[in-house]
A protein has these predicted regions:
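All-alpha prenyltransferase/terpene-synthase fold signal
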Residues: 1-336
């Protein structure tokens, strides 16, 4: 059974305007990424580049570049910080795939399947080391504080997710706490470091951080909806991976809490006890459809997307502001 995501029409938004506006800086970021994955240890660039060159949108570093431009920053530090943000993101993906025992990432075989769990973890650690090295080279204490704090929060989020895995009693607030830490924190930091380099006032920094935080929450909500309603070829992973891995995401939280006693027993067996049988994924999709769990997840994503857009309301109109607003619309309207 397929769940149809509640988008009124094909996604009209795109990242094209943002991509075009930051293209010159992004070329420099990509060159930095390529240079910093280099190592005399041959396995390091092999593992790192397997994921880095696999077609990710580079959204987080683009946000760093765009926000630096929005803040009027005229130096070069944002290039290394954008590369550091991408390395932090890539490291979390390498680590996540080990924790989740994932077989696919971005439509390719996960690095852990080719080089093993140990190599994936250690190369992730290498990328984090390179990220911190670039932060230090930029020599801006505030930017270093923002990104290093984010690294700690992200790790906390990963541990928090371990605590909610297979726990069907997880409530919506607990779920949101996990995704704020695990996903949205890096979006927030990516959006804050550019204005920090430009020495903007606290109110402006807070607005940029709010934009990133709420965009990150919306982004993860859509990812969680797509895991049950998307298509494998476009998702870059198998539909239902979250179900098979026992992850308690918002579609599950809503379905469990709105369900009957027998339906809750189903969730306790499949996710709580990891006893998944043939036909259980279809049953899960059926229950989500019955309780409008997918469409309500998307509705919440729209809510957080609106908060992100409103965060920049006092910023004067510009091409870069319009591109950031369109990026929000794209992230929410991803019709995979």
């Amino acid at each position: 059974m397929a769940v149809v995501l509640p988008f009124e029409s094909p996604n009209p938004a795109s990242l094209n305007r943002l991509v075009e506006l930051v293209a010159p800086d992004m070329e420099r970021v990509n060159a930095t990424i390529l240079a910093r994955t280099g190592s005399e240890v041959a396995m390091i660039p092999e593992v790192a580049n397997h994921l880095i060159t696999s077609g990710g949108k580079r959204l987080r570093p683009m946000l760093t570049l765009a926000m630096a431009r929005l803040a009027g920053y005229s130096g070069d530090g944002h290039i290394k910080l954008a590369a550091a943000v991408e390395f932090m993101h890539t490291a979390t993906l390498l680590h996540d795939d080990v924790v989740d025992e994932s077989g696919m990432r971005r439509g390719k075989v996960a690095a852990r399947m080719l080089w093993g769990n140990e190599a994936s973890v250690l190369v992730g650690d290498f990328l984090l080391g390179q990220a911190f090295k670039m932060m230090v080279e930029v020599a801006n204490l505030h930017a270093l504080e923002i990104l290093s704090s984010a690294a700690a929060v992200i790790a906390e989020g990963e541990v928090m997710q371990l605590g909610t895995a297979k726990n069907t009693a997880t409530n919506e607030d607990e779920y949101l706490s996990v995704i704020r830490a695990k996903t949205a924190e890096l979006f927030a930091a990516a959006c804050e470091v550019g204005p920090a380099l430009a020495a903007k006032e606290k109110a402006e920094l807070a607005a940029c951080r709010s934009f990133g935080m709420n965009l990150g929450i919306a982004f993860q909500l859509i990812d969680d909806a797509l895991d049950y309603g998307g298509k494998s070829a476009k998702l870059g992973k198998n539909v239902g991976d979250d179900f098979r891995e026992g992850k308690i995401t918002l579609p599950v939280v809503l379905s469990f809490r709105r369900g009957t006693e027998s339906e809750r027993k189903f969730w306790n067996r499949t996710l709580g006890d990891a006893d998944i049988r043939d036909g259980d994924l279809d049953q899960a999709l059926s229950l989500m459809a019955k309780h409008h769990a997918i469409e309500d997840t998307v509705g919440r994503a729209r809510h957080y997307g609106a908060i992100a857009t409103d965060a920049l309301a006092l910023v004067p109109p510009s091409d870069i502001k319009s591109a950031l607003e369109e990026a929000v619309a794209f992230c929410i309207g991803r019709a995979h």
